[in-house]
Amino acid sequence: MKLQLQCFLINDLEKYNCINVSVSDKVFGYPFNPALIHQIVSSYLINCRQGSKSQKSRSDVSGSNKKPWRQKGTGRARSGSVKSPIWRSGGVTFASKPKKYDQKINKKMYKGAMKSILSKLVCDNRLFLIEDLFLEKPKTNLLLKKLKNITSDRSVLIVTDNVIDKNLILASSNLHTVKIYNLNSIDPVSLINFNITLLFRTIVESLELRLS
């Protein structure tokens, strides 16, 4: 079964045409699964952690192992080492050490989360297809005018084919709410971070094949 999505044919800065394009309901009409999306997005964010945090415990701190003073008779609190965590420049009580936070993401779960997110974007009218987004010059103002024909929202993710136009990259570099990704770079986190997602019409078939 096929779904109909709007595809914008942007001819110039003022006018554009809109046609309906058939897409697979197995990708863009997938049931919404918030629990699966949460699990995959959490795993993606955890996998971004470096895990390089390191602190020194009392065994790692440099210093003498000699007892500072005798146990009794001085009137001061007993102490066994200058490297004690309660001393200044001493070690940390439960020192953090480098470790891996990697979580495995199954392919079937990843595809299900991607299809669920794309379908939710379609249902919320936040995903559109565009035929092309050619810029004559690398001007941010030109890009904003063309995007304004499609949506008034400034938070936009543009997904292109593997060859990204250089002018498009330069024009969007001044806009922190507009990002240009190719088909191989998108992931569940990037899809949910933007209010509007624009897909090039040429990548729809490849995207459906990848997620089928």
From Swiss-Prot:
BP terms from Gene Ontology: translation
Aminoacyl-tRNA synthetase is among the record's keywords: no
Cellular component, GO annotation: ribonucleoprotein complex; ribosome
Gene3D superfamilies tied to this protein: 3.40.1370.10
Chain spans, region Disordered: 54-85
Alphabetic keyword roster: Ribonucleoprotein, Ribosomal protein, RNA-binding, rRNA-binding
Biased segments, Polar residues type: 54-65
Entries under InterPro entries matching the protein: Ribosomal_uL4, Ribosomal_uL4-like, Ribosomal_uL4_dom_sf
GO MF terms held by the record: rRNA binding; structural constituent of ribosome
Pfam family, one: Ribosomal_L4
Coiled-coil spans in chain: none
Function as written in the Swiss-Prot or TrEMBL entry: One of the primary rRNA binding proteins, this protein initially binds near the 5'-end of the 23S rRNA. It is important during the early stages of 50S assembly. It makes multiple contacts with different domains of the 23S rRNA in the assembled 50S subunit and ribosome.
Family as reported in the entry's similarity comment: Belongs to the universal ribosomal protein uL4 family.
Quaternary assembly: Part of the 50S ribosomal subunit.
PANTHER family named among the record's database cross-references: 50S RIBOSOMAL PROTEIN L4, LARGE RIBOSOMAL SUBUNIT PROTEIN UL4M
HAMAP family listed in its UniProt record: Ribosomal_uL4_B (MF_01328_B)
Name of the protein in its database record: Large ribosomal subunit protein uL4
